[in-house]
Design a protein with these regions (language model features):
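Residues forming the flavin
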Residues: 3-72, 76-85, 93-94, 98-204, ...
């Protein structure tokens, strides 16, 4: 029997910080959730210690245990800071007496650990008439099928709006084959890779499902519930730091696509938006290149969600050509750093390292360097691999990936330094080299004003420059430049690997990373590493490996949108969304933004139709 899931019922009491020693868990709960599963019984989630939690909840509320009529687990985490490992729960309890329930909430009003459980049920704002959508131009179009595009399309389909999805890449299983072609055979498919294709960049990542965004409507819960509905492990609903992993995401993404189609939506793969058409500053149509036929066609559209992802550089350039308002924004650049996972486990878990319930340890580090730069760990992947993440010929980019089990030999994370538009290129020749003569000439004749002195595409230019240098330094065959941490700290080139074997495929070439990144970046990282070693013993170990370059930490620009309608102020009917447009960072926040934008589209199409509330 699977673990109960907290619902959105009102007048349920949520209690946090309920702690139990590990020994209190049922024996079957002490195995790792990703342990080998030979039978259907093995695959079921281990039960929570509900009786023990019921006793704790009753004690916290000051009532008899019999007064707790129901209890469900909302979150579970672990506290390994002391000798005895503790399991920490957040639970939702229903009291048998409604009047007592209300009085308890009043009594504990100032106790932050005892609060009313919020209603987390997603309700669609509208629902289209059954016969709606016969005219193609009425149907909303979603450009991009990563986490943002998937959830925009899903909620639009759930509201009866029959969206049309345009995705330049391939279905996820073909995309996986193409991606392995780069990793194993040095062969890049620019249309089907880590960045482009069904599932977006998040498919080839750790599959993290937590975020620091403000989410007062609990839309993140909607995202995770849909993931579970289509095959994600049920424990993502209560794990403190939930993740899915690449292989499991493949199945989930396929299920979400099939649901969108079942509800009347349409998903078109290997089709790329190459231009837009608009009338009176309102979107009218998209020009789409069909790679299967090598033909271009026009798709009428009045509502277009731009869920482009952070690597759709050609689309950004096209939108800029049409004067769609956008601006350069800060992002971060650096490298991937790898250590033996056992080193991180010992540093983080101490004597509990290796415990199956704890799994592979993660970390989060930050340092403010003397040169004013901030160095921090990014997208940490316990028990994972460093992957080749380029989407353009002649460029090298790194990223991190983990499977659900997180059982690979190494831990990796981005080690990155924050940069902002003041660091980006301004030379017209650089713009021409990376973006073409038209933009280069425009930059030459631009007169910067006090409001906007940074070209919106300047961060993109910097990314391309760094990725091209990394490609050359790696040997011009998609191998990546790398260096031992000890050599980097000592400011000398590496000539050979040591005890840590880098996981990046197709391979690495040992160099001095000073030649791959700006000096202010390498100086800040060199200062930070020994200090990180004081926080996590072994982090600055000589044999750890740094592989570059990490340039796509987030989008280098933001496409402007209205705070209420979520539409572009330049062209009505365009809805910039997700990470590529600068409104998310990661799977969960991108999915949440997709839901918000899907709702905005529905409200714009049917401003006077409200869905019936249960």
């Amino acid at each position: 029997m699977s673990c109960p899931i907290a619902t959105g019922r009102l007048l349920v009491i949520r209690l946090s910080e309920l702690k139990l020693p590990l020994i209190a868990l049922p024996v079957e709960a002490r195995r790792a959730s990703d342990a080998p599963a030979e039978t259907d019984e093995d695959r079921k989630l281990a039960p929570h210690p509900l009786d023990a939690l019921r006793q704790l909840a009753a004690h916290a509320l000051g009532i008899d245990e019999a007064g707790v009529s129901d209890l469900t687990v909302f979150k579970r985490s672990f506290d390994a800071r002391k000798q005895n490992l503790l399991v920490v729960y957040i639970v939702d309890v229903t009291i048998s007496d409604d009047a007592l329930e209300k009085s308890l909430l009043v009594k504990h009003l100032k106790n932050s650990h005892i609060q009313a459980t919020p209603n987390i049920t997603w309700l669609p704002p509208v629902h289209a008439p059954a016969d709606w959508g016969k005219a193609k131009q009425d149907r909303p179009v979603v450009v991009g099928f990563g986490p943002c595009g998937i959830f925009a399309a899903l909620v639009l389909a759930q509201m009866g709006l029959k969206p049309i999805v345009i995705e330049r890449g391939t279905p996820v299983r073909q995309r996986t084959k193409d991606t392995w072609g780069l990793w194993r055979k040095h062969v890049l498919n620019p249309r089907s890779n880590v960045q482009f294709g069904e599932g977006g960049a998040g498919t080839f990542s750790d599959g993290k499902l937590y975020s620091q965004i403000k989410d007062p409507r609990h839309l993140g819960r909607k995202v995770m519930q849909e993931f579970v509905r289509f095959g994600a492990p049920e424990d993502i609903l209560f794990a403190a730091h939930p993740h899915i992993g690449t292989f499991k995401l493949v199945k989930v993404v396929e299920g979400l696509r099939e649901e969108i189609i079942r509800l009347g939506g349409e998903v078109r793969f290997e089709q790329r938006v190459v231009d837009i058409e608009y009338e009176a500053n309102s979107i009218a149509a998209l020009r789409i290149q069909d790679y299967a036929t090598n033909q271009t066609y026009t798709l009428p559209a009045h509502h277009v969600v731009l869920a482009l992802g952070h690597s759709a550089r050609d689309t950004f350039t096209m939108l800029h050509r049409h004067a769609v308002a956008m601006q350069a924004k800060p992002f971060s650049i650096g490298v991937r750093i790898e250590h033996p996972q056992s080193v991180i486990d010992r540093a983080r878990w101490g004597q509990h390292a290796g415990h199956p319930l704890l799994g592979a340890a993660d970390y989060k580090l930050v340092h403010h360097a003397a040169n004013g730069r901030t160095v921090y760990s990014f997208c940490m992947c316990p028990g994972g691999t460093v992957v080749a993440a380029t989407s353009e010929v002649g460029r090298v980019v790194t990223n991190g990936m983990s499977q659900y089990s997180r059982n690979e030999r190494n831990a990796n994370a981005g080690l990155v330094v924050g940069i902002d538009p003041t660091d980006y290129p301004t030379d017209p020749d650089a713009f021409e080299a990376e973006l073409g003569q038209e933009i280069g000439n425009a930059v030459r004749h631009d007169t910067p004003n006090a409001v906007d002195t940074f070209h919106p595409l300047s961060g993109l230019v910097l990314q391309r420059q760094l990725e091209a240098v990394a490609y050359t330094l790696g040997g011009s065959n998609y191998e990546a430049p790398a260096q031992l941490v000890g050599d980097f700290i000592a400011n000398r080139a590496s000539t050979a690997l040591a005890s840590v074997e880098p996981s990046y495929k197709p391979g690495v070439k040992m160099i001095h990373l000073n030649s791959a990144l700006p000096q202010f970046v390498t100086d800040a990282m060199r200062e930070a590493l020994p200090l990180f070693g004081q926080k996590i013993k072994g982090f600055d170990m000589h044999d750890a490996v740094m592989t570059g370059v990490e340039t796509r930490t987030s989008s280098p620009l933001r496409i402007d949108r209205d705070d209420v309608s979520l539409q572009s102020p330049s062209i009505a009917g365009l809805y910039p969304a997700g990470e590529g447009a600068g409104y998310a960072g990661g799977i969960l926040s991108a999915g949440v933004d997709g839901i918000k934008v899907g709702e905005a589209v529905a409200n714009a199409i049917f401003p006077n139709i409200t869905a019936k509330r249960p």
